[in-house]
Amino acid sequence: MNLFEKMTDQLHETLDSALALALHHKNAEVTPMHMLFAMLNNSQGILIQALQKMPVDIQALRLSVQSELNKFAKVSQISKQNIQLNQALIQSLENAQGLMAKRGDSFIATDVYLLANMGLFESVLKPYLDAKELQKTLESLRKGRTIQDKNDDSNLESLEKFGIDLTQKALENKLDPVIGRDEEIIRMMQILIRKTKNNPILLGEPGVGKTAVVEGLAQRIMNKEVPKTLLNKRVIALDLSLLVAGAKYRGEFEERLKKVIEEVKKSANVILFIDEIHTIVGAGASEGGMDAANILKPALARGELHTIGATTLKEYRKYFEKDMALQRRFQPILLNEPSINEALQILRGLKETLETHHNITINDSALIASAKLSSRYITDRFLPDKAIDLIDEGAAQLKMQMESEPAKLSSVKRSIQRLEMEKQALEMEKKESNAKRMQEILKELSDLKEEKIQLEAQFENEKEVFKEISRLKMEMESLKKEAERFKRNGDYQQAGEIEYSKIPENKKKEEELQRKWEAMQQNGALLQNALTENNIAEIVSQWTHIPVQKMLQSEKNRVLNIESELQKRVVGQEKAIKAIAKAIKRNKAGLSDSNKPIGSFLFLGPTGVGKTESAKALAQFLFDSDKNLIRIDMSEYLEKHAMSRLIGAAPGYVGYEEGGQLTEAVRRKPYSVVLLDEVEKAHPDVFNLLLQVLDEGHLTDSKGVRVDFKNTILILTSNVASGALLEENLSEAEKQKAIKESLRQFFKPEFLNRLDEIISFNALDSHAVINIVGILFENIQKKALERGINITLDEEAKELIAEAGFDRFYGARPLKRALYEMVEDKLAELILEDKVKENDSVAFVVENNEIVPKIK
C-alpha cells in the first residue's frame, strides 16, 4: 500500500484542494503551505473545528497564509499533468505516516498530518496562536480514538459537527429566560432519570413553547437546579438536516448517525434533543437502507440513549401512532397553550431581553395588549408565540423609526427643497409681478431654515442621550453576565464587587439619563423609544386588516352611538336596529358568551324593507368598510349535494383543494359580518351545518381544519312570514303568532333556539319612504359633485318620487328605478348635451306634477 492509499478521505480531499490552489496561483509545485491553506478553507475540517475552540482570528490567519502563497514563483504554462508535489510535501506526508504508526492508526488522518508537521507551519502560525495550545485542542478532539477506516476522521466530534450544545449556550447567557412550565420540566426530569425508556417527547401545537422547555432544562442544569443524576449533563440539539446534507454515498447517512449514537453512549453525559422528531421516520432511507427511526430504536429501548423529542400532535398521530415500536420508546408530555395571564408572565420575563436587543423601553400596557389582542384577533396561531411576535415586531418597527430621520425634520427639509425650486423658477422668469411671491418665499425659507437648524440640534441631542442610555444598558447586561460567571466559579469576592459596586453605580447613571430623557419626552421629543399598546394595535391591524381604533378603549364610546349611526342608512326599522344594537353592546361590554359568534340574527320581513342593507350598514359601522361583509346567496344551495360547497368538497371529489366558500372566506377575514341571504331557499340540511357555528363558534372544513367564527356576526335573512308582516288588518300579537307558525314550518326548533335574536322588519310607511328617497338621492349627488355639478331635490319632488316608486309589496327597491327615470336620466341628458358644465347647479323641482331640472 503506497503513501496515497494510506490517506483518509478527508486528507485526500485536502491534497486535491491544495493541487487546485497551486494551479490557480500558477505555481509549479504543491507545497505544505498549499495544504495548510486548503485546510483553512474547509469549514467542516478538523483544523477549523480546533481553531473555533481557541481565541484566534481565523480570517486574519487565512490572509497571512494567502500572502505567503503569493510570494511563490509563478509559471505561465502549468497544467494538472505537469504540476508536481515538492520534496517538502512528500517529506511531510512521510512524517505523518511515522506518527500514524506510533498512534496505532491504520490511515493518515488530517490531525496527524498537522501534529507531525507543526514545525513546518510554526513561523506562519506563531503571530496568531500558540502551537502547543493547538496540539492540545487537536488531541482533545480525537478523544483517544484510533483511525481504522478511511472516513473515520470525518466523524471526529460528530456531536460538535451535527449538534448545538444548549448547555454551552445557557452558560454564555445566549438563551432567553424560560418562565413557567415548571410541571413539564419536572416531569421531563423524572422521565430522564428512569432506567429504561427514559426518553420524553414533548407534544403541543406550534408556538406553545416545546423548544423553550428544553432550553429551560439546559438553564437549570447550568444553574445546578436539577437532581444529582442530571448534574453535568449536556443537552445537545441534533440537526437532522446536517446529518443528511452532503451524504453522497449509500450508507453514509446511517454511518454518521451510528457515530453520533456511539459518541453519546461513550460520553454518558449527553442528552440528545431532536426538534421536529417526526422527521426521523423515513429520514435518510433509500432502497435497501434503514431510516433514522429504525437505527435509533435499539439504543432507545435499552436506555443507552437519552433523547428528548418535540413534535406537534398532528405529526405524532401521523408518524408515531402508526409505529407502535417507536411510540412505546417515548413517554409523552402534553404542553397545552398557556392562558392569557400565563402568556403575560412569559412576556414580562422576556421584556428585559427584548429591551436590550432593540434598545427601547417596553411599557407594561404593551405586554398586556399583546397578550389580549393576539388571543382575540389572531386565532390561527398559539400563545405565547404570537404575543412574543407582536412585541418583537412592534419593537423592531420602533427601533427602525429611532434610527431614521424624524418625520418632522424630513417634512421641513422637503418644504425647503420645494421652495428653493420655486424660487429658482421665479428668478428665471424675471417678471415684476413675481416680486411679492419672491418676498414670501424668502421669508418662508428663512423661517424654515431656522427651524431646520433647531430640529437638527434637538435630534442630535436626543440621539446622544439615547445612545448613552443604550450603552449603559448593554454594559449593565455584560456586568450581570460577568457576576453570574464569577458566582458559578465560586469567586464570590469578584461577584460581590460587581453586584454591590459597579452595578449600582451604573444604575445611578442610567436613572439620571432616564430622567433627562423623560423631560425631553414631555417637552415634545422627536424620538419615541417606548413601545405602547397603540404600537401593538397597529401591528395587529397590519396582520389582520382590522382598523386600529376597533381594538382600543375608544371603540367602546363609539358603540354607544350605534343606533343613530345605523339609522342613517336603514330607515323605518327602529325596533330591528334597537335589537341589533343591544347585542353588539352586550358583546363590547364583555357580557356575551366568548365561545359564540358576536351575534347571530334571523332577519324576517318582506322584500325591499332593509334586511340586507342593515347587514351592510353593520359591516360599515364595525369595520369601516363594506368589504368585510361575506355575502352568500343561499338560493345557490337548493340541492343537498351543493351543501358541501360551504365547507369544501370531500376528499377525492373535484374542488377538494379549493376549500369551502364559507370556511375559506371566514378564515381569510375572521373579523367580519357573514350574511346568508334568502336562507329559506337553501336545502334543510344546511341548517345542520350552522348548528355548530351558532353553539360553539367554530366549523370544521372538509380538510379537518377548524375555522373560528367567534369574531363574526352571523346574519340570516328570510322572506318567511312576509305575508303576515304586510297584512294591515292583523294586530301585533296576531302577526307574531303567524310568524311563529311560519318559522316552525321552515326551520327546526334546535336551529331557532340557538339564534340570539329573531328580528321582524315591518313594511315601510310613507314617511320612511321619503327619507329613503333622500338617502338614494345623496348617492346621485355625490357622483354629480365628482364632476363639479351641484344638484338639489326639494321636498315636493321627494314626495312625488316616493308616490311614483313605492309599492308596499316590493318595498323600497322600485324607488331606485323611479329615481333613475325622474332624476338621473334627465341629468345625464343635460351633461351629454353640454347644457350643464362644471361649477353649475341644477335644482330638480315639480312643475305640472312632473319633475323638471332648473339650471342655475
UniProtKB/Swiss-Prot annotation:
Span list, region Linker: 338-545
NBD2, as annotated region: 555-763
InterPro entries xref list: AAA+_ATPase (IPR003593), ATPase_AAA_core (IPR003959), Clp_ATPase_C (IPR019489), Clp_N_dom_sf (IPR036628), Clp_R_dom (IPR004176), ClpA/B (IPR001270), ClpA/B_CS1 (IPR018368), ClpA/B_CS2 (IPR028299)
Keyword terms of this UniProt record: ATP-binding, Chaperone, Coiled coil, Cytoplasm, Nucleotide-binding, Repeat, Stress response
Stretches for region Repeat 2: 85-144
Domains: entry comment: The Clp repeat (R) domain probably functions as a substrate-discriminating domain, recruiting aggregated proteins to the ClpB hexamer and/or stabilizing bound proteins. The NBD2 domain is responsible for oligomerization, whereas the NBD1 domain stabilizes the hexamer probably in an ATP-dependent manner. The movement of the coiled-coil domain is essential for ClpB ability to rescue proteins from an aggregated state, probably by pulling apart large aggregated proteins, which are bound between the coiled-coils motifs of adjacent ClpB subunits in the functional hexamer.
Protein's recorded name: Chaperone protein ClpB
Originating organism: Helicobacter pylori (strain ATCC 700392 / 26695) (Campylobacter pylori)
Taxonomic lineage from the root: Bacteria, Pseudomonadati, Campylobacterota, Epsilonproteobacteria, Campylobacterales
Name of the gene encoding the protein in the UniProt record: clpB
